[in-house]
């Protein structure tokens, strides 16, 4: 029988205090049957992305413990960072990897949301495949106004009523929980400190503004450099190299260039192979030509 593997990639609103990050990771790692694969902290975004995998019961319990720990240690009234956010645990996506379906992940998201709402008294919004409201499928729509805006609206605006939990915000804010396919978090840095250029480029490449399908983008300023921060929601249909080349063309319009890029968290191997194939212009290439693919079979 195929082992069930589900990935969870929660984003926590803390990227500067190592003690807090370590405590959240420890809470997740303490669950039997869960393996933490990656921890990526960003001080400018003031955000940490943790990637872990496990079976359905273990992954659900680990996510709950991570959310509970974050709620104890992160005060959203004091939080500052470049990245949009709603709560101490901002977003918790579940991703089917092996022996699991999207429906399995939707069920986990709903169970976890109900528990977080009742036991931790944190408002929960379901998004992507788990959304109960079509208007909440897109994370950016759910997160609009961020923590500060939601705090003003949640009690009085019916459209901002959570799926689970109270219609009020405590210091842990709100949490968005859902199910989705694999996503690539990808950032590109420009040789300028003009954030308006990054914002214009982000507007050009993101789908919601008429750009590339399956691309979400923001223009930010990180460590004095303009950054185009992106989520690539379907790398099979909009590959990394297509995004890079479009940003290069857009940057040239403003007299700037791409100086570096970064991946946040883990990335599917095929996405990187597709990028290598494009830039190396390889003909007739197959995964059988990769040394490590044979070693993995042993």
Regions inferred by a protein language model and the residue ranges of each:
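Long, contiguous binding/interaction regions
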Residues: 2-298
């Amino acid at each position: 029988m195929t082992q069930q593997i589900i990935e969870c990639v929660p984003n926590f609103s803390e990227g500067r205090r190592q003690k807090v990050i370590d405590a959240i990771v420890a809470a997740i790692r303490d669950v039997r049957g869960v393996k933490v694969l990656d921890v990526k902290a960003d001080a400018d975004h003031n955000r940490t992305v943790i990637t872990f995998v496990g079976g359905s019961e273990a992954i659900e319990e680990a996510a709950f413990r991570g959310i509970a720990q974050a709620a104890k240690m992160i005060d959203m009234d004091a939080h500052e960072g470049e990245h949009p956010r709603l709560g101490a645990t901002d977003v918790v996506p579940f991703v089917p990897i092996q022996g699991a379906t999207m429906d399995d992940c939707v069920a986990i998201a709903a169970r976890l949301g109900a528990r977080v709402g009742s036991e931790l008294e944190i408002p929960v919004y379901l998004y992507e495949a788990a959304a109960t409201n079509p208007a909440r499928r897109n994370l950016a729509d759910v997160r609009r106004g961020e923590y500060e805006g939601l705090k003003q609206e949640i009690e009085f605006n019916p459209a901002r009523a959570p799926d689970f939990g109270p219609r009020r915000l405590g210091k842990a804010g709100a949490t968005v929980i859902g199910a989705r396919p694999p996503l690539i978090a990808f950032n590109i840095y420009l040789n300028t400190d003009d954030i308006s250029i990054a914002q214009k480029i982000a507007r050009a490449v993101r789908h919601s503004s008429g750009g590339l399908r399956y691309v979400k983008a923001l223009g930010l300023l990180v460590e004095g450099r303009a950054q185009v921060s992106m989520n690539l929601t379907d790398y099979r249909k909009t590959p990394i190299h297509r995004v890079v080349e479009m940003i290069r063309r857009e940057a040239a319009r403003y007299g700037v260039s791409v100086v570096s890029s970064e991946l946040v968290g883990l990335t599917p191997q095929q996405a990187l192979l597709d990028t290598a194939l494009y830039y190396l212009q390889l003909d007739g290439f197959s995964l059988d030509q990769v040394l490590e693919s044979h070693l993995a079979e042993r």
